[in-house]
Amino acid sequence: MTQITPQEALQRTIEHREIFHDEMLHLMRLIMRGELSPVMTAAIVTGLRVKKETIGEITAAAEVMREFSNKVHVEDKRHLVDIVGTGGDGANTFNISTCSIFVIAAAGGKVSKHGGRSVSSKSGSADAMEALGVNIQLTPEQIARSIADVGIGFMFAPNHHPAMKNVAPVRKELGVRTIFNILGPLTNPASAPNILMGVFHEDLVGIQVRALQRLGAEHAIVVYGRDGLDEISLGAGTLVGELKDGVVREYEIHPEDFGLRMVGTRAFKVDNPEESKAMLLGVLHGEKSAARDIVCLNAGAALYAANVASSIEDGMARAQAALDSGAALAKLNELVAYTARLTA
């Protein structure tokens, strides 16, 4: 194991030089164990941000975060998928990916959803799940059972990454994006081999998909809407980085490719968790709307990532059927009842 002092690491970032894989492993372990001072931690993560984190640095940091996490052991991972965003897009949309998980599970996928409370949005995935009546305070064993029995397991990030408490005050005080914003989506506690990930900057599409490749992902789709959305957008083209069969492809897709009309993000904007819940439930109750279209498109891509569907188009058709039949709404009700029983 190559040792590097925190001061040497900081000097590297100032000189815009890379911190190599083994060095980053050592440095990240110091941070995760709380062995660096808040000042040094802040300096290093800020330096990395200014320099721009490399694929190697991100991969090594994610490996350490996974190492320190409380894991969820899932037996059958064939169709296991996470649908997650880095957040920070500033769009304040309703919980598109959270709504999508019920559609995905109803259409034959299994979802290990990794999320937390709101940081930059009006409603984080954990806030949304609680508002819907889902108990998010489950043990790793209970989450694994929920995935097996219902097809959905929600993993509340603070319960799975206790070492992050060592950097939480630094992140809060800095108030800017750091490497930790892009590590969360790379550190699914159930090690989902398939993922649909939204990112907040176009440069991250190629970076994150290649980090996922190095971390052993099987089918990964990383997306960035050109209107700034960290989802597949209806308001603009969406940049895509796809890892499949060990090969990365980058391309662009548009709403009209899927027979959908372009709609600006204002159509999905909410001001509080109650509005987000109302829009989400409207979709699950089968209302025809732009909100339904963006959920079907993103759930369809996740079903393709999960190898349930043969393409995004096929996934979208399956998503529409799950909503029209009422199966997606039934899946929400099933999860609410199941998680209530587990802790009764």
From Swiss-Prot:
Amino-acid positions noted as binding anthranilate 1 in the UniProt annotation, renumbered to this chain: G85
* A molecular-function term among this protein's GO annotations: magnesium ion binding
> Quick one: which residues bind anthranilate 2?
R171
The prosthetic group or cofactor this protein requires is: Mg(2+)
Q: In which pathway does it act?
A: Amino-acid biosynthesis; L-tryptophan biosynthesis; L-tryptophan from chorismate: step 2/5
A GO term from the CC aspect: cytosol
Residues engaged in binding 5-phospho-alpha-D-ribose 1-diphosphate: 85, 88-89, 93, 95-98, 113-121, 125
| Entry binding sites for Mg(2+) 2 | D230, E231
Quick one: which residues bind Mg(2+) 1?
S97, E231
EC no.?
2.4.2.18
* Keyword terms, alphabetized: Amino-acid biosynthesis, Aromatic amino acid biosynthesis, Glycosyltransferase, Magnesium, Metal-binding, Transferase, Tryptophan biosynthesis
- Check the record and name the Pfam families matching this protein: Glycos_trans_3N (PF02885), Glycos_transf_3 (PF00591)
List the catalytic activities from the record.
N-(5-phospho-beta-D-ribosyl)anthranilate + diphosphate = 5-phospho-alpha-D-ribose 1-diphosphate + anthranilate
Set out the biological process GO terms recorded for this chain's protein: L-tryptophan biosynthetic process
Enzyme class comes to transferase
Q: What does the note accompanying the cofactor annotation read?
A: Binds 2 magnesium ions per monomer.
> Its function?
Catalyzes the transfer of the phosphoribosyl group of 5-phosphorylribose-1-pyrophosphate (PRPP) to anthranilate to yield N-(5'-phosphoribosyl)-anthranilate (PRA).
This protein's assembly is summarised as: Homodimer.
**Family per similarity comment:** Belongs to the anthranilate phosphoribosyltransferase family.
Protein name as annotated? Anthranilate phosphoribosyltransferase
- Native organism is Delftia acidovorans (strain DSM 14801 / SPH-1)
Q: What is the lineage of its organism?
A: Bacteria, Pseudomonadati, Pseudomonadota, Betaproteobacteria, Burkholderiales
The gene name on file is: trpD
